[in-house]
Structures are given as structure tokens and as C-alpha cells.
Amino acid sequence: MNASDLIRIMQFGDSVLPVGAFTFSNGVESAIQTGIVHDVATLKGFVLTALKQAASCDGMGVVVAHRAVVADDRDGIIRADWAVNNRKLNEESRLMATRMGKKLAEMSIHVVEHPLISWWLEQIKNGNTAGTYPVTQAVVMAAQGIGQREVVVMHQYGVAMTILSAAMRLMRVTHFDTQHILFELNHDIEKFCDIAEIGDINQMSSYVPIVDVLAAVHVKAHVRLFSN
């Protein structure tokens, strides 16, 4: 990998990329409020579950969309996007995916200036597609020539960091703890990337009941710091 590709991966995979990720907790807020997550060990377990679920749903969407971009199959990109959106059972998950996806597309047309990204944002604005974050990420990175494996890794990193960053504001956990968790999950992320690279829409699954239960709890929570 050359330096140019690496720095683009670092830029678009940065946890402070201005796409609104800081407003979401990926479900960990409710998990902490209900006591499911209460220490470093349970936080690590929650992140691991989220990464596995992301690999079998959003991660596969990333791969399918990336392959469609490479094949210049624009209908295939849209099919992948709706497949991701339709598998998000709770409203908060759909809101997170579509809000961040649109923000990424809006930012990227000013940074990358690629016709495919302009087309993609137009489809989102016209309601022709949902504009989920995983598929938008695939479109933006594939347009820059970044490989599918690297984009899946970016997505996995984003899932983990969204949860860990939120956890630091919600529970007694240190920077050292969260970085250690992320480091320890490296080998698991490698396996989850293999799952995502199956790249088959028909095998995409978002079945993690606890996530949807926590989302329902979060909707009715009296105090909320995050949007999900």
C-alpha cells in the first residue's frame, strides 16, 4: 500500500471525521443504564458482539457495494444500500446509518470531487436510496481506489470507536482501558472481516435481540446523552 492510500484510509477512518458519529453510542448508553455493561470486561464483550453483528450485516453491505462500484453497477450499489437499511429493525439504528451516510456524502463531494459520489448524493436527496453509512463509505473509498478489505477494516474500527468513545462519557473507564480493548480485539476484527467478505446480500443478518431490546429501552429513557 502506498502512502497516499494509507493517509486516505486514516483520514476517512478517523473517529473525529465530521459525520456526526459523536452523537451516537451504538447502543452502549442503554447497555450501561440497564447494567448490562458495568466494567471493562462487559464493555469489551459488548464491543465484540457489536463487531460480529456489524460484520454479518453492514460489513457485507460494504463488500457488496464496493464490488458494485468496481463493476460500475450503480443499480447494485442501490440494492446493497436498501439491503442494509431494511435489516435495521429499530428506528434509531436507521437514523444513525442514514444521517451519517448523508453527512459523509455531503462532505466527500467537497473533498474528493468524484462524479460517482456526486451521483450518490443526488440519489440520497431524491429518495432513490436510503444512503446508509456503510454503503456510502464503500462508495467514497472505492471511488478513491481503496480495496474492499481495507474499507471493511475501516468500518469495523468505526463501530468499535463509536462505542468506546461513548463509554468514556458514560461509565468509569479510562483511555488506557478503551485502547487496550481495541488492541485486544484486533484478532477478532480480522476474523470478522473474513465474514464480511462473503459479500452475499442473501446471507446478511442483523439478528441480535439484545440490541433491539436496548434500542426500545433507549427510546423511552428519561435521560439520554446520545441519539441511540
From Swiss-Prot:
InterPro entries: UreF, UreF_sf. GO terms for cellular component: cytoplasm. It is found in: Cytoplasm. One of its GO terms (molecular function) is nickel cation binding. Pfam families: UreF (PF01730). Keywords: Chaperone, Cytoplasm, Nickel insertion. It comes from the Bacteria. Its main location: cytoplasm. UreD, UreF and UreG form a complex that acts as a GTP-hydrolysis-dependent molecular chaperone, activating the urease apoprotein by helping to assemble the nickel containing metallocenter of UreC. The UreE protein probably delivers the nickel. HAMAP family: UreF. Required for maturation of urease via the functional incorporation of the urease nickel metallocenter. Belongs to the UreF family. This is Urease accessory protein UreF. It comes from Yersinia pestis.
